[in-house]
């Protein structure tokens, strides 16, 4: 009798575990559409994002999100990720980090 109850509990636990592991919430599919255009999901990245008006940020005034501009893109004043070369008033002397421009 006791072994039948144990077997039943074990079976229910296994089914629940399989259901949790195969649920869409544990897959990466929810990330599709989570970030905006030219952004990529990265929950492990820390620091400040480069911006058109601040190519070498040392202090972030707002909390960093998990959506970062893709390589070759920086944020403009409206927080949209645009190509580095599309930043207004970018002088040729202004250098962005190699991780941003993809060198």
From Swiss-Prot:
CDD domains named in the record: TIL
Gene3D superfamilies named among the record's database cross-references: Laminin (2.10.25.10)
Keyword annotations from UniProtKB, A to Z: Signal
Signal peptide coordinates: 1-22
Similarity remark: Belongs to the polydnaviridae EGF-like motif protein family.
Transmembrane domains' residue ranges: none
Entry protein name: Probable protease inhibitor Egf0.4b
Domain TIL span(s) in chain numbering: 35-87
Gene: O11
InterPro entries xref list: Ser_inhib-like_sf, TIL_dom
């Amino acid at each position: 009798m006791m072994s039948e109850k144990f077997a039943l509990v074990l079976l229910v636990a296994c089914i629940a575990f399989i259901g949790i592991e195969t649920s869409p919430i544990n897959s990466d599919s929810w990330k599709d559409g989570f970030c905006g255009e030219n952004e990529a999901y990265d929950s492990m990245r820390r620091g400040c994002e480069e911006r058109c008006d601040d190519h070498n940020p040392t202090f972030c005034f707002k909390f960093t999100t998990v959506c970062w501009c893709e390589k070759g893109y920086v944020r403009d004043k409206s927080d949209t990720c645009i190509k580095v070369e599309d930043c207004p008033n970018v002088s040729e002397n202004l250098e962005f980090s190699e991780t941003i421009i993809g060198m």
